Amino acid sequence: MKTLVVDAYDSFVYILVEYLKQLDMNPIVYRINEINIALIEELSPDMILLGPGPGHPKDAGYTEIIHRFKGQIPILGVCLGHQAIGLAFDCKISKACNLRHGKKSLITNDQQCIFQHFDSPCLVTRYHSLIIDKEGFNNDELIITSN
């Protein structure tokens, strides 16, 4: 399995890369300004990971990738990448009411796919200022798998 990791200039992406290596997911890393649709097609990854980074997801450069490969290649977004997926599917991105920079909290999950080996609830460390606002969430293309 080959995993394309798109780095939006955040060092945490390399922790994710190490996890992917441990899972034999063969990560290849490109910075957001080095990647384009043609190169992704040429690389032919089995999965795309859109990494964390600074700023607002509307400015991340991920939207074109999401729209082009949705439904064809599994796409996982972490932090900024997660927010960009929500934005690409017309979800509202809001400032978090309670900032969780480096804070631990319990989340519930559906124990499916990427959560299949996790308890629910499980303890996670969060580091974000923006959220996908679930108030008014009405999207039949996305499924909420954790909360």
Task: Show which residues each predicted segment covers.
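A short acidic, often aromatic-flanked loop/helix-cap motif at beta-alpha or helix-coil junctions
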Residues: I35-A38, H101-G102, I132
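Cysteine-nucleophile active-site neighborhood
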Residues: P45-H117, P121-L123
